[in-house]
């Protein structure tokens, strides 16, 4: 996201295309690396979703969510460290914040809430059907990529496509507590939306999956 927002590097690539490509490929990379170890659970919404349909043990839900938040915090700290000079030179405060957390393009939180519910619902339902059909790894990773990249293409312009409560909140926290020259608000008044909406979308996807399968 830093390469998407920050002024000295944001014009190196076609921003929207590379942002979509990066988002999809990063999710595939995570799934490939951590899939055999944890089922690629790096998102609390995913963990809650699979727990809701009985595919994840109750005693591990809180453990995984805490680990996901710690991981997001560490990654955010690394991002701040690597891009600190560019962040300090950025004169657009929204671009500084957008390098860490999501920013909605309008102030209607109800529509923003609905947008992320729909996007998370779509992605999680894809993951459920993949888990149900159990395609070969290459095919499964392709659908993970298209699900994420397609979501960014379709809805990213509305709310920046949060889908992961841990990623959004912990990176927003790093923006708030770490020194960045001339930074503005971390917009915690909006933070509840990207935290709550993916969970709602995930639960709705779980209910539909249980109803159909």
From Swiss-Prot:
Family annotation (InterPro entries): Aquaporin-like (IPR023271), MIP (IPR000425), MIP/Aquaporin (IPR050363)
Molecular-function annotations in GO: glycerol channel activity
Motif (NPA 2) on chain: 164-166
GO CC annotation: plasma membrane
Membrane topology: Multi-pass membrane protein
Gene3D superfamilies (UniProt xref): Glycerol uptake facilitator protein
Entry keywords, A to Z: Cell membrane, Membrane, Repeat, Transmembrane, Transmembrane helix, Transport
Source species, domain of life: Bacteria
GO biological process terms, semicolon-separated: glycerol transmembrane transport
Cysteine disulfide partners in this protein: none
Chain ranges passing through the membrane: 22-42, 63-83, 112-132, 138-158, 188-208
Cellular compartment(s): Cell membrane
Entry's free-text remark on domains: Aquaporins contain two tandem repeats each containing three membrane-spanning domains and a pore-forming loop with the signature motif Asn-Pro-Ala (NPA).
Name of protein: Uncharacterized aquaporin-like protein HI_1017
Organism this protein belongs to: Haemophilus influenzae (strain ATCC 51907 / DSM 11121 / KW20 / Rd)
């Amino acid at each position: 996201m830093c390469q998407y927002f920050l002024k000295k590097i944001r014009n190196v690539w076609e921003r929207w295309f590379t942002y979509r490509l990066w988002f999809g490929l990063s999710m595939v990379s995570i799934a490939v690396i951590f899939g055999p170890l944890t089922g690629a659970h790096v998102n609390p919404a995913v963990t809650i979703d699979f727990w809701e349909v009985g595919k994840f043990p109750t005693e591990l839900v809180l453990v995984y969510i805490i680990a996901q938040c710690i991981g997001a915090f560490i990654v955010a700290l690394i991002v701040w460290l690597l891009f600190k000079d560019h962040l300090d030179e950025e004169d657009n405060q929204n671009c500084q914040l957008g390098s860490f957390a999501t920013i909605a393009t309008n102030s209607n939180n109800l529509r923003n809430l609905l947008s992320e519910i729909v996007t998370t619902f779509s992605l999680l339902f894809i993951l459920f059907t993949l888990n149900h059909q159990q395609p070969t790894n290459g095919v499964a990773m392709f659908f993970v990529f298209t699900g994420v990249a397609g979501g960014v293409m379709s809805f990213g312009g509305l709310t920046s496509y949060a889908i992961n409560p841990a990623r959004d909140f912990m990176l927003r926290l790093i923006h708030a507590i770490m020194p960045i020259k001339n930074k503005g608000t971390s917009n915690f008044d909006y933070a509840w939306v990207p935290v709550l909406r993916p969970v709602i979308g995930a639960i709705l996807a779980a209910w539909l999956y249980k109803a159909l399968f």
